[in-house]
Amino acid sequence: MTRNTSEEQLILVDERNRAAGSAGKTAIHRAGLLHRAFSIFVVDARGRIVVQQRSPDKYHSGGLWANSCCGHPRRGERTIAAARRRLGEELGVTSALSFGFFARYQAALGNGMHENEFVYVYFGRLKSAPRPDPAEIADIAHLSFDDIGRRIARDPHAFTFWFKHYFRNHGAEIARLAEQVSRLAAM
């Protein structure tokens, strides 16, 4: 089970992604401070993206569907190392991750929480069956890029803000990179 991470010290950044200090995770999300984050899209051998339904007990966006894994590097931690760590903690898998693109977004999430993130988006190949931590993940699904788009269009309130943001603003990149990872899986 994942430990309580509410007071982890996360990396504050400026608009150019330069480290500008640190603060506790809860305080950052209450105040909407700009901070460093990552998101991961894990792709299976059939080219489908592993998506997760967040645990209803999460401090924000509980019960909503999101990409494979997301999180924050801790103060002093490299972003790629944090991404690998969280992939194991949340999904119970390891994967060689490749950088895909940067994303930047800001949103009020309700419940007094705000996202204001500079995000490193990584892609990886699923090599073993996920073993999700139930404290983090309520359910998982393997969906094609087109299936995800249809589901978001049909029921947008079932998805996290950031997942919809990625598909709206980086959809072509996600489709291209997921296809590349899928081709590597077939080799």
Predicted feature residues:
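Acidic, metal-coordinating catalytic segment for phosphate/diphosphate chemistry
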Residues: 2-39, 45
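A glycine-rich, hydrophobic loop/mini-helix early in the fold
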Residues: 37-69
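A residue-level structural signature of the nucleotidyltransferase/glycosyltransferase Rossmann-like core
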Residues: 10, 48-49, 140-141
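Nudix hydrolase/Nudix homology domain
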Residues: 24-26, 63, 101-109, 113-187
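The catalytic Nudix box helix
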Residues: 51, 68-100, 122
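Short, low-complexity, intrinsically disordered N-terminal peptides in bacterial proteins
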Residues: 1-7, 182-187
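Short, catalytically relevant binding-site loops at active-site mouths
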Residues: 56-58, 72, 104-107
